[in-house]
């Protein structure tokens, strides 16, 4: 398999200087998004239609919620399902009926496709429509794909939120302008942003996904969309098709990124720059103070970012500009130029960007560079550690609350911690 992938690998440099690679990949699938989404939407349930491997992945990654039943499960496809010996739709209907009878608290059910369900062409969109009609109005059933075929793991959230867009209510014709923050955020971060938006004078603010399915925000031409994550391409497109307008901004990582993100929203709502600066100044100062101790530890250290989560470019901007790290290479699975238009000019001149993945070639470049820190997926971390390189799991940067002023120090600490561990082990 490695030999075949290597033979088919393509590496090219585009006129814009981005190294584009198409070869062997090393990624988690979109099912991983359930780990944080099932905690966010409190009356939703995620039913994966997949194999035992899918079940092991979700169970291992998410664990079991203490003192509560988990809000995810797997309808396991057996060999007879794959062989077409039974009607998979009948089996799915039976499982959903059992689930909803046992869990009356479920108000929103996601049928999540996987590699096996896509291979046998199981039409989960028709199943979702059929089941939604059957269990309406108490339960709404939607579907999306968490398959790992030609995707990366954060696309699971994008697919989930894109599935919600068609069922968002339409705002009234005379609705006043509203702000929709898109992307799953920890509740504590969401609450911080709500307070800051209110202090800026923006009070008509909603978040997608909401904490409960009954709180789906109304959208329309007067809705301004502010992305909290850079990997929400399908969701942004679906919102724009419904008349929403996206605000271009850097992403809220670090003090600088958060300030620019909030300022872009304020500008779209006509808030004066003087008021924005007065409001944000003490918050920026607090973030600066938190970052100072980590800057002393990390400044001048060299970092290599493998393509994995799609947040690599905002992370690189934060590490270079606010922490003083040197960027050896910044890889990203997909380079969405429109969504990253405010980020790309903020990277240091001459930064090596790579889009896509050819893991063997990237490993060769990483080994040759011998950076102080490697940000990569779990599958690469242990082998690189065995070779004497210090690593940081990129997936941890998705699980952990890192957005906003108050979390700037926590974000920096995530990069300082593995280097500190390495120092202690060397003593």
UniProtKB/Swiss-Prot annotation:
Gene3D superfamilies with a match to the protein in the record = Nitrogenase molybdenum iron protein domain
Whether ATP-binding counts among this entry's keywords is yes
Alphabetical UniProt keywords:
4Fe-4S, ATP-binding, Bacteriochlorophyll biosynthesis, Chlorophyll biosynthesis, Iron, Iron-sulfur, Metal-binding, Nucleotide-binding, Oxidoreductase, Photosynthesis
The GO molecular function terms of this record are:
4 iron, 4 sulfur cluster binding; ATP binding; metal ion binding; oxidoreductase activity, acting on iron-sulfur proteins as donors; oxidoreductase activity, acting on the CH-CH group of donors, iron-sulfur protein as acceptor
Lineage of the species this protein comes from: Bacteria, Pseudomonadati, Pseudomonadota, Alphaproteobacteria, Hyphomicrobiales
Q: Any binding details for the cofactor?
A: Binds 1 [4Fe-4S] cluster per heterodimer. The cluster is bound at the heterodimer interface by residues from both subunits.
Give any single GO term for biological process.
Answer: light-independent bacteriochlorophyll biosynthetic process
Cofactors named for this entry: [4Fe-4S] cluster
- Enzyme class, top EC level, equals oxidoreductase
Listed name of the protein: Light-independent protochlorophyllide reductase subunit N
């Amino acid at each position: 398999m490695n030999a075949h992938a290597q033979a088919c690998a393509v590496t090219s440099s585009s006129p814009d200087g981005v190294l584009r690679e198409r070869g062997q990949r090393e990624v988690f699938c979109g099912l991983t998004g359930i780990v944080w989404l099932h905690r966010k939407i409190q009356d939703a349930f995620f039913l994966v239609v997949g194999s035992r491997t899918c079940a092991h992945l979700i169970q291992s990654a998410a664990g079991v919620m203490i003192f509560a039943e988990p809000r995810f499960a797997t309808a396991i496809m057996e060999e007879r399902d794959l062989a077409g010996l039974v009607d998979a739709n009948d089996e799915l209907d039976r499982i959903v009926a059992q689930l909803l009878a046992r869990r009356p608290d479920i108000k929103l059910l996601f049928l999540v496709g996987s590699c096996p369900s896509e291979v046998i062409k199981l039409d989960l969109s028709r199943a979702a429509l059929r089941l939604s009609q059957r269990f309406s109005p108490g339960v709404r059933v939607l579907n999306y794909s968490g398959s790992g075929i030609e995707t990366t793991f954060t696309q699971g959230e994008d697919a989930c939120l894109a599935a919600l867009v068609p069922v968002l209510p339409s705002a009234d014709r005379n609705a006043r302008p509203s702000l929709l923050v898109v992307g799953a955020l920890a509740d504590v971060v969401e609450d911080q942003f709500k307070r800051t938006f209110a202090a800026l004078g923006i009070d008509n603010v909603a978040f997608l996904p909401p904490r409960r399915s009954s709180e789906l925000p109304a959208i329309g031409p007067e809705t301004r969309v502010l992305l909290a994550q850079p990997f929400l391409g399908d969701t942004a497109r679906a919102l724009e098709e419904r008349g929403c307008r996206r605000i271009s901004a850097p992403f809220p990582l670090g003090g600088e990124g958060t300030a620019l993100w909030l300022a872009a929203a304020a500008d779209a709502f006509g808030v004066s720059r003087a008021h924005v600066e007065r409001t944000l100044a003490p918050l920026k100062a607090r973030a600066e103070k938190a970052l100072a101790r980590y800057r002393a530890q990390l400044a001048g250290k060299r970092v290599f970012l493998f393509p994995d989560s799609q947040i690599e470019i905002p992370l690189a901007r934060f590490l270079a500009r606010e922490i003083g790290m040197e960027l050896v290479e910044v890889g990203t699975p997909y380079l969405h130029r429109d969504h990253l238009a405010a980020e790309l000019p903020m990277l240091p001149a001459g930064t090596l960007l790579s889009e896509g993945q050819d893991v063997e070639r990237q490993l060769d470049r990483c080994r040759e560079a011998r950076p102080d820190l490697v940000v990569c997926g779990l599958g690469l971390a242990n082998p690189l550690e065995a070779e004497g390189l210090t690593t940081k799991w990129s997936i941890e940067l998705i699980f952990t609350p890192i957005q906003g002023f108050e979390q700037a120090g926590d974000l920096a600490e995530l990069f300082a911690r593995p280097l500190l561990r390495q120092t202690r082990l060397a003593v």
